[in-house]
């Protein structure tokens, strides 16, 4: 089934349900016969005491070396300390950089400038919405998520919102190129430029400029509040959405919830040097080890990864097997209305792959 090329991929199990769903994803990928040399590296809360950090250098070294990672979710404490690292793509910096979470550290240290998340309806998956076929392109390096904030006495807290022309153009070009290469009809820039006239205004200006280079792709723009209202009212009006960092974080979770939940939406963080494939959802430590987690989102991220690796046949095989098992509704996890465990659901997909191959 798979090709003869041995691909090197970094596997980051993650926290909580991470080891279960990365293990499930690995099983279905290997069932296709694709040859992958997995570099398994651990980070997150599980290694903090041993390593003195949630993101050891060897994790970033591995992803830099392989260029591709399949990553489980991480526990991100509310509040608490920032993650400091001297690691950069060009060697160790004299002064460490601080990031708000291990997820943010991996993305920004590896210079992944764009996050792509997909939300699609699946036959057999309960949802209040139909006709959802949305791609969210999220700028990933700036906005208020640069974590530049400070207190002024005890009564004020200030956060800096940064939007640059270069990062905005990178996200916009990615969105239009994705639309062009995947038969998408429209790109919508999402913003709040009526209030944030300088920052979101710059983002919108750049998107408009980039749109002129893709005349075959329809372009429009909407304010963030109108966008979320429109998504829940008429999701079929939307195709590819491009937006600054914080809006993208929120809208991608909304769209995932519209197609069956966070367990159904795959994603990837993409940069010039690396691509990190992950699910939209968190680590869910409350159900860790119970064998009940839905691994579909990460499995679909694995499908995206296979396509990047040039293993199109294997990607299509995994995707078809997932869709058929979901449609049959015999072996689906409890969040989708079934009774199957994570391992039972995974085994059903593996068996389907064997039958389809």
Residue map of PLM features:
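Short, Lys/Arg-enriched N-terminal segments with co-localized hydrophobic residues
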Residues: 1-5
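Glycine-rich phosphate/diphosphate-binding loop of Rossmann-like nucleotide-binding domains
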Residues: 9-31, 153-225, 237
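Buried hydrophobic positions in well-ordered alpha/beta secondary-structure cores of metabolic enzymes
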Residues: 15-18, 67, 137, 175, ...
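Buried hydrophobic packing segments
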Residues: 25, 29, 207, 298-306, ...
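N-terminal beta-loop-helix "entrance" segment that forms/cooperates
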Residues: 35-60, 231
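Glycine-rich phosphate/nucleotide-binding loop
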Residues: 45-47, 57, 230-333
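N-terminal glycine-rich phosphate/adenylate-binding segment common to multiple enzyme folds
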Residues: 49-158, 246
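Glycine-rich phosphate/pyrophosphate-binding loop and the adjoining helix
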Residues: 141, 147-189, 193-196, 312, ...
């Amino acid at each position: 089934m798979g090709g003869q090329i041995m691909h090197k991929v970094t596997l980051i199990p993650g926290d909580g349900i991470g080891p279960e769903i990365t293990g499930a994803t690995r099983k279905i990928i290997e069932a296709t016969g694709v040859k992958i040399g997995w570099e398994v590296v651990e980070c997150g809360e599980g290694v903090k005491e041993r390593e003195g950090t949630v993101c050891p250098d060897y994790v970033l070294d591995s992803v830099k070396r392989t260029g591709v990672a399949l990553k489980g979710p991480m526990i991100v404490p509310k509040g608490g300390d920032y993650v400091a690292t001297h690691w950069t793509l060009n060697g160790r910096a004299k002064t460490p950089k601080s990031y708000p979470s291990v997820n943010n550290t991996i993305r920004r240290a590896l210079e992944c400038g764009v996050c792509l998340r997909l939300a699609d309806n699946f036959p057999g998956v309960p949802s209040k919405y139909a006709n959802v076929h949305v791609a969210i392109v999220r700028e990933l390096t700036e906005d208020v998520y640069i974590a530049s904030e400070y207190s002024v006495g005890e009564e004020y807290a200030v956060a800096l919102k940064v939007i640059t022309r270069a990062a905005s153009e990178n996200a916009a070009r990615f969105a239009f190129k994705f639309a062009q290469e995947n038969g998408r009809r429209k790109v919508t820039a999402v913003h709040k430029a009526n209030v944030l006239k300088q920052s979101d205004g710059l983002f919108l200006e750049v998107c408009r400029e980039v749109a002129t280079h893709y005349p075959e792709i329809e372009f429009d723009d909407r304010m963030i509040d109108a966008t979320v209202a429109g998504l829940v009212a008429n999701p079929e009006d939307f195709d590819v959405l491009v937006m600054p960092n914080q809006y993208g974080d929120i809208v991608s979770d909304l769209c995932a919830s519209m197609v069956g939940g966070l367990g159904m939406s795959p994603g990837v963080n993409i940069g010039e040097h690396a691509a990190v494939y992950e699910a939209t959802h968190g680590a869910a430590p409350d159900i860790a080890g119970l064998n009940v987690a839905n691994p579909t989102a990460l499995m679909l991220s694995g499908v995206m990864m296979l396509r990047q690796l040039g293993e199109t046949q294997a990607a299509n095989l995994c995707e078809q097997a997932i869709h058929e098992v979901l449609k049959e509704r015999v072996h689906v996890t409890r969040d989708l209305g079934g009774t199957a465990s994570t391992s039972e659901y995974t085994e059903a997909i593996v068996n389907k792959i064997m039958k389809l191959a």
